[in-house]
Structures are given as C-alpha cells and as structure tokens.
Amino acid sequence: MTRLLIVGPPGAGKGTQAKRIASEYGIPDVSTGDIFRQNIKDRTELGQQVQALVDAGNYVPDELTNRLVTARLQEEDARAGFLLDGYPRTLAQVAYLEELLQGWGQELDAVIQLVADEDEVVARLTRRAAEQGRADDGEEEIRHRQEVYVRETSPLIDVYRERGLLLEVDGLGEVDEVAERIRAALAGRGVRPSSDAGRA
C-alpha cells in the first residue's frame, strides 16, 4: 500500500506530477477540487452544501471537506493506497487525517513537497497568462497567490518535517526530470512504483 500527499505552490506543476505519480504507483490521484466538482455534478447532499458555500463566496469548512475526503478514501480504488492533492490544508485537517488513517490501521508513507523559486514560478505563470490572454492574472495577483500558499502550508510542512515524512523535491525543470527526482526520493523511502501500474 502506498499512501502519499503532494504539496507545491501554484505553477510548480503539482497537478501534472500528481497524475503521473498516481499512474506509475497504481494509486488514485485524490484531489479535493475534483471531489468537490464530482459531488456538485452528481448533486449529492454534500455536493449541494459545497455549491451553496461556493456560490456565497465562502470557504468549504473543515468538517465538510473531511467528510468528502473520508467518503472518497473508502471507495474501492483507494483501498490499496492513494495520492492526496489539495488536502490536508489546515492543522485540524492534518490531525483528522492522521486519526482517520490510524483508525484503519494505516499511516502516510511520505509527503512530497515540490519546491520552486518564487521568482521563476511567477515568471512562468506570467508568461502563461500572457499567452492565454488572461490580463487579470498579473504579477501582483500571482505573487499574492504564492504568499497565500506559503502562509497556509508552512505550518503543515513543519509538522510533516518534524515527523520525518517530508520529501523536498526541486519542482523546476522538465516534467520528466521532476518525475525522476520524485521517484528517486520515494525510492529512498522504500516506496517503489507498482508493477501492476497501468494494467487494467
């Protein structure tokens, strides 16, 4: 069983790497954004609660996010492991996830942190916004999102570093280079790709 988290600033290629890791290690990429969207689309009771909060411009509270993530991790494909992307985001969610996994006799194997120089990420995102004609995505807005990321994730990163779970990986470079760095970091922790990955 492989149970991983991935964190990284906007523009560090986290979504791309998450899909790749999930495929190579034969585990589902469990993204809170995807869970929210699927529940809204399916018009589940929880999905309707999320929709009402989002429509009102409010954050989805921990309790609701925790319930949605718990339900997703109980699905058949997540029983043999998972890669969590976008969760946990608060210290309360960190504690909840730990308690949840302990209740199932499980624990996290590693937390992958994609590390990227802020100036390089800002330059990358500014270029992308210009190419896509998104004038509202200026450097100031992009830097603000980077600051929010650092402020929100620093306490979580500290917790996982203290627990010896954190794997810091340089997130800049070609997609294949970054993927290889992640594989090497996980191998150092004894986590290897699934021989069944890619077989359906």
UniProtKB/Swiss-Prot annotation:
Gene3D superfamilies: P-loop containing nucleotide triphosphate hydrolases. Its EC number is 2.7.4.3. SUPFAM superfamilies: P-loop containing nucleoside triphosphate hydrolases (SSF52540). CDD domains: ADK (cd01428). GO terms for biological process: AMP salvage. AMP binds at T32, R37, N58, Y59, V60, G86, Y87, P88, R89, Q93, R134, R145. Signal peptide: none annotated. Keywords: ATP-binding, Cytoplasm, Kinase, Nucleotide biosynthesis, Nucleotide-binding, Transferase. Residues 127-137 are annotated as: LID. GO terms for molecular function: adenylate kinase activity; ATP binding. InterPro entries: Adenylat/UMP-CMP_kin (IPR000850), Adenylat_kinase_CS (IPR033690), P-loop_NTPase (IPR027417). Coiled coil: none annotated. ATP binds at G11, A12, G13, K14, G15, T16, R128, G173. Pfam families: ADK. Residues 31-60 are annotated as: NMP. Pathway: Purine metabolism; AMP biosynthesis via salvage pathway; AMP from ADP: step 1/1. It is found in: Cytoplasm. It catalyses: AMP + ATP = 2 ADP. Consists of three domains, a large central CORE domain and two small peripheral domains, NMPbind and LID, which undergo movements during catalysis. The LID domain closes over the site of phosphoryl transfer upon ATP binding. Assembling and dissambling the active center during each catalytic cycle provides an effective means to prevent ATP hydrolysis. Belongs to the adenylate kinase family. PANTHER family: NUCLEOTIDE KINASE. This is Adenylate kinase. It comes from Clavibacter michiganensis subsp. michiganensis (strain NCPPB 382). The gene is adk.
